[in-house]
Design a protein with these regions (language model features):
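His/Met- and acidic-residue-enriched segments that coordinate or traffic transition-metal cofactors
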Residues: 2-9, 16-176
Length: 176
């Protein structure tokens, strides 16, 4: 079964290379088989991840308990910084990619769900979302930092990953 899944992943990855945007990255196949995303896909996903982290954490600053607010403030500060760093790489011409203007549909759905919650329900969902978002971000940054095709972006991803790993550990601790 595992071999069939991996073979299917390779087939999707190969087929998707003929199209502009990577279906393999969108569907998670690249993550499953450990393949680095294309530069454009990495920029899109990293920027959208920052947007989600900032928006959801600003909401947590309004609705959460003190421990969660402390975490949320760090997320806002850190992700605003990484967002600016990524923008500088792209606008400075070191990375040939287009920054997205909005987060993904799934991130919008997660944020919409959070906006409908209050109290303990909000806190539990925010903690779970943060853990999931940081697991995905760590994986994305690891894959690009290890095997990305743009040297400047690859170095930035590798430099940024330890902070994301720390965020993940913090999110896991909050989620207990």
């Amino acid at each position: 079964m595992k071999h069939l899944l991996i073979a299917s992943g390779f087939a999707i990855a190969l087929a998707s290379s003929a199209f502009g945007q990577s279906a393999a990255e969108k569907t998670g196949v690249n993550s499953l088989i450990g393949v680095a995303p294309k530069t454009e896909d990495f920029v899109t996903e990293a920027a959208a991840s920052d947007m989600f982290e900032i928006a959801s954490s600003k909401l947590a600053l309004e609705r959460a308990d003190n421990a969660t607010k402390t975490f949320a403030q760090q997320m806002v500060t850190d992700h605003q910084r990484t967002s600016e760093e990524l923008k500088a790489l792209v606008s400075g011409g070191k990375v040939k990619a287009t920054l997205p203007t909005d987060m993904s549909k799934s991130q919008h759905s997660m944020l919409d769900k959070l906006q409908k919650l209050n109290g303990d329900d909000f806190v539990k969902q925010y903690h779970a979302d943060q853990e999931e978002a940081h697991e995905m971000a760590v994986d994305l940054f690891k894959r690009y930092g290890d095997e990305g095709d743009n040297a400047d972006l690859k170095a930035w991803a590798a430099k940024t990953r330890p902070a994301l790993e720390h965020h993940l550990q913090m999110a896991k601790a909050l989620n207990k």
